[in-house]
Amino acid sequence: MFATFGFIALFAVLGAWARYGQTLLVQAAFGRGFPWATLSINVLGCFLMGFLFFETLERISVSPELRTGMLTGGLGAYTTFSTFSLETLVLFENGEAVKGLLYMFTSLFLCVGAAFAGAWISHST
């Protein structure tokens, strides 16, 4: 259990650094007019989550502690959108398309709505 926490902490630091570094690079290249940095992080993070989840499950032998550190710590710090995408993918792969669609649209509506609500509360205080 302590090894798992250690790997999560280590990879979380690396994931956060990667996110910050990529944000600086993308914003320097494309500016801040559109959230290209966040979009690129979310897309790459989702790709890596899907890829590493199955690679470390089916092809590459790594300890469960290291796997959890990479996926939960590293990609969790890099982007939480990758976890949402993996959970949606798993629902579809398990033949639960209706549940997957419900989860996708509910998450999008609630999360964007929560962001708007937080902004509204912040602006009104």
UniProtKB/Swiss-Prot annotation:
Q: One short Pfam family name for this protein?
A: CRCB
Going by the entry's taxonomy, the superkingdom of the source organism is recorded as: Bacteria
One GO molecular-function entry = fluoride channel activity
Which of this chain's residues are annotated to bind Na(+)? 76, 79
Gene Ontology BP terms: cellular detoxification of fluoride
Q: What is its main location?
A: membrane
Membrane topology term reads: Multi-pass membrane protein
Q: Which reaction does it catalyse?
A: fluoride(in) = fluoride(out)
- Stored InterPro entries: FluC (IPR003691)
Q: Which UniProt keywords apply?
A: Cell inner membrane, Cell membrane, Ion channel, Ion transport, Membrane, Metal-binding, Sodium, Transmembrane, Transmembrane helix, Transport
Q: Where in the cell is it found?
A: Cell inner membrane
List the transmembrane segments: 1-21, 34-54, 72-92, 101-121
- Activity regulation information from UniProt: Na(+) is not transported, but it plays an essential structural role and its presence is essential for fluoride channel function.
Cellular component GO terms, alphabetical: plasma membrane
Report if keyword Membrane is assigned.
Answer: yes
According to its UniProt entry, the function of this protein is described as: Fluoride-specific ion channel. Important for reducing fluoride concentration in the cell, thus reducing its toxicity.
Q: What is the recorded name of this protein?
A: Fluoride-specific ion channel FluC
User: Which species does this protein come from?
Assistant: Acidithiobacillus ferrooxidans (strain ATCC 23270 / DSM 14882 / CIP 104768 / NCIMB 8455)
What taxonomic ancestry is recorded? Bacteria, Pseudomonadati, Pseudomonadota, Acidithiobacillia, Acidithiobacillales
